[in-house]
């Protein structure tokens, strides 16, 4: 949805910049071991002012035969809700062993409901997942992407530096 403009409205540089997408890129490969409890990613988070936003995540990840991939969810501050209460996820399914697997996920989940992406071929091969949702922000607050291993194991699961968050204000 385009940012709302009204006939005769004065358009300023500040007003134009309000609707420009903001990109937040993961800064380095990050590994987590021996955990299935999603915790906030140190990079993939942003503080939002009141308004309506499209939130898009592109996730590069990997796992091993032991760790199996990643599980994801979101945490948000009070005053932030998902419009329609769900996020849409797509990528390799939790039973996938390679990124070329026919096992895929295309689902709607609540923000705190874990989505599981499988991949067991190690860090040399990365899987790709996408998540999208629309946020209604009534009070300033932060949204945080969270992740952990699919299966707790000493072998790590990774989120890659090509992962990014795109946030676009739509209202």
Kindly give the residue locations of the regions a language model identified.
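C-terminal interaction-tip segments
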Residues: 77, 138-171
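Extracellular beta-rich ligand/substrate-recognition surface
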Residues: 28-40, 61-63, 117-127
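Terminal beta-strand-rich extracellular "head" domains
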Residues: 64-132, 160-161, 168-171
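A glycine-anchored, Pro-Gly-centered beta-turn/N-cap motif
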Residues: 49-51
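Short surface loop/edge beta-strand patches of beta-sandwich-type extracellular domains
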Residues: 42-45
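Short loop/turn segments at connectors of secondary-structure elements within structured domains
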Residues: 5, 66-68, 139
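A short beta-strand element within beta-rich, extracytoplasmic domains
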Residues: 53-61, 145-147
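Glycine-rich, low-complexity segments
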Residues: 1-38, 84, 169-171
């Amino acid at each position: 949805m385009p940012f709302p403009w009204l006939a005769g409205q004065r358009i300023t540089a500040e007003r134009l910049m309000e609707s420009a997408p903001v990109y937040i890129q993961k800064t380095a490969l990050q590994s987590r071991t021996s955990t299935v409890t999603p915790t906030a990613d140190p990079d993939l988070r942003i503080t939002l002012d009141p308004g309506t936003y499209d939130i898009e995540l592109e996730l590069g990840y990997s796992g091993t035969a032991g760790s199996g991939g990643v599980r994801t969810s979101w945490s948000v501050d009070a005053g932030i809700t998902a419009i329609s209460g769900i996020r849409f996820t797509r990528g390799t399914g939790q039973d996938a062993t390679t990124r070329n697997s026919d096992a895929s996920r295309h689902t709607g989940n609540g923000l705190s409901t874990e989505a599981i992406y499988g991949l067991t071929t190690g860090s040399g091969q990365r899987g790709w997942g996408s998540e999208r949702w629309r946020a209604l922000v009534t009070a300033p607050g932060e949204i945080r992407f969270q992740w952990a291993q699919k299966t707790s194991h000493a072998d790590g699961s990774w989120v890659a530096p090509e992962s990014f968050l795109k946030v676009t204000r739509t209202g």
